[in-house]
């Protein structure tokens, strides 16, 4: 199953709201900037990966990467 930028943005938005954090507070805490945070939540495909990872970490969202060889081994 392919994960889309829109799905990642929706997860970030839902997590942020669930924590009671405003977009401005997230921008200040993560140091990424309000415009970037809003664009990422809206699923903008050209968002910088490093900043996106910073936001995920700030919100406590764990990202797991699985290589194709690991998938074939049932991992």
What are these regions (language model features)?
Residues 1-18:
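A short, Lys/Arg-rich alpha-helix, primarily the initiator
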Residues 2, 45-49:
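Alpha-helix boundary/capping and short turn/kink residues
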Residues 11, 22, 48-51:
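Residues that mark the N-terminal boundary/hinge immediately upstream of a DNA-recognition element
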Residues 17, 28, 57:
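Short polybasic/polar patches that bind polyanions
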Residues 21-38:
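Short alpha-helical DNA-recognition segment
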Residues 45-46, 57, 64-75:
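Short, charged recognition helix plus adjacent turn
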Residues 52-56:
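Hydrophobic micro-packing sites on short alpha-helices
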